[in-house]
Amino acid sequence: MAESHATGTTTHTEVPHGKPEFPPFNKDTFASQLVSFAIAFALLYVIVSRFALPRVGGVIKTREGTIEKDLAEAQAFRDESDLALKAYETELAAARTRAQAIGSETRDTLAAQSDAERKAVELSLSAKLAEAEKTISDMRTKAMGNVKAIAADATSAIVQQLSGTAPDAQLIDRAVDASLKGGRDAA
């Protein structure tokens, strides 16, 4: 309701009471409007069903085909990766087995070499020990032989010094032998 307050002119926008109503609400044209709606919807249905729906259906089918193709490709890649993983695990197990076999073989070889070297060293040491024992025994025998002669000479000198007479050599030898053996022989 806009009114102009200008002098001399007045404009009204209201509809006077005898004029027709808004056409969609007019009861006289209601039946023709329903027929127009039915024709418009039928025409819209035909246009949509003949042109729009086939295009949308084609797009949907194309998209479904693309999705199925992508899923099949993804499954193929997954199967391929599963096969590669199994092959990797098989090769890894085989490599582990080979490594253990090589390690065992190396350990056995080194143990055999070590045993052979140890036995050779033991034989060498045994030979050296036997030689050393023989040398010691020979030296002891030689030393004991010298001890007997020295003891006999010393005993003879002592007895001669104390008694003033030369003792019997056989008697001194028996006394020295008895003394060296650890026994006492009264002479």
Swiss-Prot record:
Residues 1-21 are annotated as: Disordered. The chain crosses the membrane at residues 31-53. Keywords: ATP synthesis, Cell inner membrane, Cell membrane, CF(0), Hydrogen ion transport, Ion transport, Membrane, Transmembrane, Transmembrane helix, Transport. GO terms for molecular function: proton-transporting ATP synthase activity, rotational mechanism; proton-transporting ATPase activity, rotational mechanism. Signal peptide: none annotated. The keyword Lyase does not apply. Its main location: membrane. Residues 1-13 have a biased composition (Polar residues). GO terms for cellular component: plasma membrane; proton-transporting ATP synthase complex. The keyword Transmembrane applies. Pfam families: ATP-synt_B. It is a single-pass membrane protein. It is found in: Cell inner membrane. Belongs to the ATPase B chain family. F-type ATPases have 2 components, F(1) - the catalytic core - and F(0) - the membrane proton channel. F(1) has five subunits: alpha(3), beta(3), gamma(1), delta(1), epsilon(1). F(0) has three main subunits: a(1), b(2) and c(10-14). The alpha and beta chains form an alternating ring which encloses part of the gamma chain. F(1) is attached to F(0) by a central stalk formed by the gamma and epsilon chains, while a peripheral stalk is formed by the delta and b chains. F(1)F(0) ATP synthase produces ATP from ADP in the presence of a proton or sodium gradient. F-type ATPases consist of two structural domains, F(1) containing the extramembraneous catalytic core and F(0) containing the membrane proton channel, linked together by a central stalk and a peripheral stalk. During catalysis, ATP synthesis in the catalytic domain of F(1) is coupled via a rotary mechanism of the central stalk subunits to proton translocation. This is ATP synthase subunit b 2. It comes from Afipia carboxidovorans (strain ATCC 49405 / DSM 1227 / KCTC 32145 / OM5). The gene is atpF2.
